[in-house]
A protein has these predicted regions:
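Membrane-embedded beta-strand positions of outer-membrane beta-barrel proteins
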Residues: 186-190, 222, 252-254, 367-371, ...
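Feature captures outer-membrane beta-barrel proteins of Gram-negative bacteria and organelles
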Residues: 177, 203-216, 235-248, 383-397, ...
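Short, ordered, surface-exposed loop/turn motifs in non-cytosolic proteins
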Residues: 74-96, 685-695, 766-782
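Short Pro-Gly-centered beta-turn/loop motif in secreted/extracellular proteins
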Residues: 99-107, 326-332, 704-730, 793-810, ...
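Post-signal-peptide, soluble extracytosolic/periplasmic N-terminal scaffold domains
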Residues: 19, 41-286, 589-662
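A short, amphipathic beta-strand motif
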Residues: 82, 292-294, 679-683, 756-764
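Short, acidic Ser/Thr/Gly-rich low-complexity loop/linker segments typical of extracellular
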Residues: 93-94, 695-704, 782-795
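Transmembrane beta-strands of outer-membrane beta-barrel pores
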Residues: 161-163, 192-196, 217, 226-230, ...
């Protein structure tokens, strides 16, 4: 024992635990005693390896000088998490070298820049060559330091704040945005039905496909659909190529797309577009899709269209319904909702949808540039070439100035607006658009439109209030879409005159809320108008929820307005049906129709991936009783639905399926429907491993999985559930952080060790293999993975994971400054296959 100081050991860990693998090591009674001690030291913490006592007095010891000082460990590559000033910034393998008895990380200026260090401010760093490594960070950045916590595999870097880049909260360096791997995918959503009415039978189906292919920063996308109703109709709605332009925080699109809908009404066109992408900003505002609420009087089919294209189709039961999973294809453009009842009657209404320009901070700007040929789903509509540009700029005193122009051969429009935040009073914006229109018959129209927008959230009262009003001051104002529909002098277009929207949401505590929304659209040259009103109150108490609603719909193509009321009640059950509820609902309308429904729905007991619903109801006006039953499976490879509906007018069988098929460099993987950016988990050989925070997502038989949604330009952590791993599976890192670029398919690659967990007892001619010797599995020539490795403990014992049924274990150590080595050919007996940890003893020669 060194006489300069008393024995003091701390921060030692995994002396006999493999560098990679799971589970603990062999027992080290004497060593563990020292590891748990703490005493005052009068000099550097130091431990003399010669002080170790072994159960076998004849036990020899390898050179353990790496462990002589507190925190000492063997040099090598370790999978670690990197923390800068107590914030995690990265994770991955780092090479550690022995520097005066302490493990120090090998760093580069590029790595420090990735961690947020202002590298350009230090000449000592800028003089380094690309890839040149260094270990002592304090020699390059004054007052900086590094500390490796071996027990938690955490590298802590302390860097003065003045040496860090000053960035907004949530900022992620664009250099870390991952363009992803080459991939191609198909996102599918299929619904269908077979209906029998009296003597007739009909079938219908709808297939929506969202296809994509990625190569580098480029993304190819396509949206197609197929409808069958007596005959097939296939339609490719849009195809485009896109990539992000990091230098200007923008998105470039080439092909079929939509113009920005913040200043002018959004229109579809084929051409080129460059527009600011706020998702690249630290405090970005995310887009939204409206919730569509309506009423069905029977088992009905609901179809949602935008710009003339069907974007959503589903089947609903009698009563009030809400659609909240839309994927709109444009930034604005009212949604046309069609409800087809079981008796064949059809009702339609308009759901307003537009993005409201939000206020910009002082000095910030955003823009949109579009050029191409206008495209419409309607026939006999002109398709002129045009250009459009819009610009927003944040001024002092919470003002935002914005404007834009649309230019075509027979149409010119200019817009100018200003918005301002008024603190507690909310935000108000107003703009004026002037337009000149020429028709093919050489008629000319000039008009203007005034728009006012207001939005306010009253946090103290839980009220959210927004209002948007469009006023067309003359009958000679035409929007771009309306102007292109003016085909001849004899045709008179009922262009829009005045439009109002209002939406108010009021919460009462944490369990009740009131929602009010209204929309009105009037037209020139017509007495008809479109109006929609919805009032709803919803509440809950001890798990019991209820709500009442009022719906009013007036369409310009219908003479009579529809008025309806609804009430619903849901009561959760207990016992073996603790994941189920009983529901009751009733509806009535101004046409004398009324209905009542009783339902039982929830998760099938013992099956978290399978939901069911049973309904029984009765309606007047000759419709009689109705009933339905449905199953909804939502698994790791997609979802499937099957339902049966019956009423006095028809019997209907419905079905559906949704999911994704992804082709990537490592094969083909099935998954749930994917978003624009998603991840491929690669854990070779680790079958049926669950992904944390992923609903029913798990790896397939090859160890691959699709994580269906990621937040672009943000840190996303993908974590494997180690509790779901089999006994022969280990991973180096349980979680990984990915930062996908827009539309990227990123790879979360896990280093797996598939094989046995083995406790070896190693002997040589002199007895047990020395304590502290290194052990490593000899790999085959075609094996490119990391070989399992570890260290010998007391009694020649070494624990390793990922070990094959047979192989060669290589052992090396330093004794009296002489390098020594031996190898053990081993075979695990078949009778040990049921053991979680196998044991192998043998002579190392």
């Amino acid at each position: 024992m060194n006489k300069k100081a008393p024995v003091f050991l701390h921060d030692y860990s995994v002396m006999a635990v493999p560098i990679r693998g799971a589970l603990g090591a062999a027992a080290l009674p004497t060593l563990l005693f020292f590891l748990c001690q703490s005493a005052t030291a009068w000099a550097d913490d130091y431990f003399d390896p010669a002080a170790l006592e072994f159960a076998n007095p004849q036990q020899k010891m390898a050179d353990l000088h790496y462990f002589a000082k507190s925190g000492g460990q063997q040099p090598g590559t370790y999978p670690v998490t990197i923390w800068v000033n107590n914030q995690q910034v990265a994770e991955g393998p780092i090479v550690f070298v022995d520097d005066r008895g302490v493990l120090q990380p090998e760093l580069t200026s590029a790595k420090l820049a990735e961690y947020g260090v202002n590298v350009s401010a230090f000449s000592t760093l800028t003089r380094l060559h690309d890839g040149e490594t260094f270990t002592r960070i304090e020699q390059f950045i004054p007052d900086a330091s590094s500390r490796f916590d071996f027990a938690t595999q955490r590298l802590n870097l302390s860097i003065p704040q003045a040496a860090m880049n000053v960035q907004s909260r949530g900022y992620v360096d664009p250099a870390r945005w991952d363009d992803g791997i080459p991939a191609a995918f198909v996102n599918y959503n299929l619904t269908g039905s077979q209906t029998r009415q009296s003597e007739t039978q009909s079938r219908s189906s709808y297939l929506n496909l969202r296809n994509g292919a990625n190569l580098g920063p480029w993304r190819l996308r396509n949206i197609s659909s197929m409808q069958y109703d007596q005959h097939y109709r296939w339609h490719s709605q849009s195809t485009w190529l896109q990539r992000d332009v990091k230098s200007v925080k923008s998105l470039l699109r080439i092909g079929d797309t939509f113009t920005s809908g913040e200043v002018f009404d959004s229109v579809q066109f084929r051409g080129v577009q460059l527009m600011s992408d706020d998702e690249m900003l630290p405090d970005s505002q995310r887009g939204f899709a409206p919730v569509i609420r309506g009423m069905a009087h029977s088992n009905a089919k609901v179809t949602v269209s935008q710009h003339g294209y069907v974007i959503y189709e589903t089947f609903v039961s009698p009563g009030a319904f809400a659609i909240n999973d839309l994927y709109p294809t444009a930034q604005s453009g009212d949604l046309e909702v069609q409800v087809k009842e079981s008796d064949g009657s059809v009702r339609s209404f308009t759901q307003p949808y537009s993005t409201v320009p939000f206020m910009l901070r002082e000095g910030r700007s955003k823009f949109s540039l579009s050029a191409g040929r206008y495209h419409s789903s309607q026939h006999q509509v002109r398709s002129p070439q045009f250009v459009q540009g819009t610009l927003f700029y944040g001024l002092p005193a919470e003002f935002t100035l914005y404007g834009g122009t649309q230019l075509a051969q027979d149409y010119q429009a200019w817009a100018l607006g200003i918005g301002r935040g008024f603190g507690e009073l909310g935000s108000l914006g107003s703009d004026v658009t002037w337009a000149n229109t020429a028709t093919p018959s050489d008629r000319h129209y000039a008009g203007h439109s005034l728009r006012v927008q207001y939005q306010k959230d009253f946090a103290s009262t839980g009220t959210s209030f927004s209002l948007a009003s469009y006023r067309y001051s003359s009958g000679s104002y035409y929007g771009f879409s309306e102007a292109n529909a003016l085909e001849s002098q004899s045709e008179r277009l009922d262009n829009k005159r005045q439009r109002e929207e209002i939406s108010v949401a009021q919460s009462f505590g944490a369990v009740s809320s009131l929602a009010i929304s209204a929309y009105s659209q009037t037209y020139w040259h017509s007495n008809s108008n479109d109006e929609t009103v919805h009032l709803g109150f919803y509440s809950a108490w001890k798990g019991v929820s209820w709500g009442v609603g009022y719906y009013y719909t007036q369409s310009s193509d219908r003479e009579k307005a529809d008025r309806s009321w609804s009430f619903n009640l849901n009561i959760p059950l207990g016992g073996w049906l603790d994941e189920s509820s009983v529901g009751y609902s009733t509806t009535s309308d101004n046409n004398g129709h009324s209905s009542q429904q009783v339902s039982l729905y929830g998760a099938v007991p013992g099956r978290g991936d399978l939901d069911y619903s049973l309904q029984q109801g009765h309606a007047n006006a000759g419709q009689g009783s109705n009933s339905s039953a449905a199953l909804d499976y939502h698994g790791g490879y997609g979802s499937a639905q099957l339902g049966y509906r019956h009423d006095s007018a028809s019997n209907q069988l419905t079905w559906g399926a949704s999911g994704s098929v992804v082709a990537h460099p490592h094969g083909v993987t099935l998954g749930q429907p994917v978003g624009d950016s998603f991840a491929i988990v690669r854990a070779p050989g680790a079958a049926d491993v669950a992904i944390e925070d992923g609903t029913n997502v798990h790896t397939d038989g090859r160890g691959y999985a699709v994580v269906p949604t990621l937040t672009v330009y943000r840190k996303n952590t993908i974590t494997l559930d180690t509790e779901s791993m089999s006994n022969d599976t280990d991973v180096d890192l349980q979680g990984q952080t990915v930062i996908p670029g827009g539309g990227a398919v990123v790879l979360a690659n896990y280093q797996t060790h598939i094989g046995n967990r083995v406790l070896f007892t190693l002997r040589n001619r002199d007895g047990a293999v020395p304590f502290g010797a290194s052990v490593q599995l000899r790999q085959q020539e075609d094996d490119t993975g990391v070989a399992p490795q570890g260290m010998v403990a007391d009694g020649g014992q070494a624990y390793l994971s990922g070990i094959p049924q047979e192989g060669v274990l290589e052992v090396s150590w330093l004794q009296n400054n002489i390098a020594r080595q031996c190898s053990l050919h081993f075979h695990i007996a078949d009778q040990q296959q049921q053991n979680t940890v196998k044991t192998v003893a043998g002579l190392c020669s």
